[in-house]
């Protein structure tokens, strides 16, 4: 299961290794991402989980010791993001995935501007992850 997530959740042209995973309200995960000559760490703090329909978590970049840091290529990137993933049935064979991703906490104007400017890249990242998931599901009986 962890290997599956590592391979499917990493964005295109990146690899991910989950160092720690405790997916439950109040739990957290800590991951190492490498790709395109960049190495970074991130942490997710799980706030709400409604199986199998919804998960809400905050996300932040960290150093290897889990101390909050900034995105290595975007020093004005918001310190913390709030992510909500909702799964809704679409007929009997499909599921609609809705992602709501926003700045969380005390966000400075320049951080919000960096977030808005990067929207296209974020869409590409989420799409790459879902493309990997779709490939996996097509291979699975």
Residue ranges and their predicted role:
Residues 8-9, 59-61, 130, 137:
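Short, flexible helix/strand-to-coil boundary loops that buttress conserved ligand/catalytic motifs
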Residues 18, 134-141:
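Short, highly charged C-terminal tails/helix-capping segments
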Residues 1-16, 132:
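Hydrophobic ligand-binding cavity/cleft-lining segments
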Residues 67-124:
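Beta-strand/loop substructures that line and gate deep hydrophobic ligand-binding cavities in soluble
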Residues 13-14, 39, 78-80:
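Short solvent-exposed loop/turn micro-motifs enriched in small/polar/acidic residues
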Residues 16-70:
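Glycine-rich portal/gate segments that line the openings of hydrophobic small-molecule binding cavities
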Residues 4, 27-28, 52-54, 84, ...:
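Structural motif
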């Amino acid at each position: 299961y962890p290997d599956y997530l590592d391979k499917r959740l990493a964005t295109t042209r990146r690899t991910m290794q989950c160092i720690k995973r405790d997916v439950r309200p109040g739990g957290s995960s800590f991951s190492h991402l490498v790709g395109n000559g960049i190495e970074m760490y991130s942490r997710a703090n799980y706030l709400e989980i409604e199986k199998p329909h919804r998960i809400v978590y905050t996300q932040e970049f960290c150093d290897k010791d889990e101390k909050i840091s900034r995105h290595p290529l975007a020093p004005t990137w918001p310190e913390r993001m709030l992510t909500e993933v909702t799964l809704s049935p679409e007929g009997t064979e499909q599921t609609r995935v809705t992602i709501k991703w926003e700045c969380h906490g005390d966000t400075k104007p320049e951080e919000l501007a960096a977030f808005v400017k990067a929207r296209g890249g974020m869409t590409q990242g989420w799409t790459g992850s879902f493309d990997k998931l779709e490939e996996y599901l097509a291979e699975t009986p």
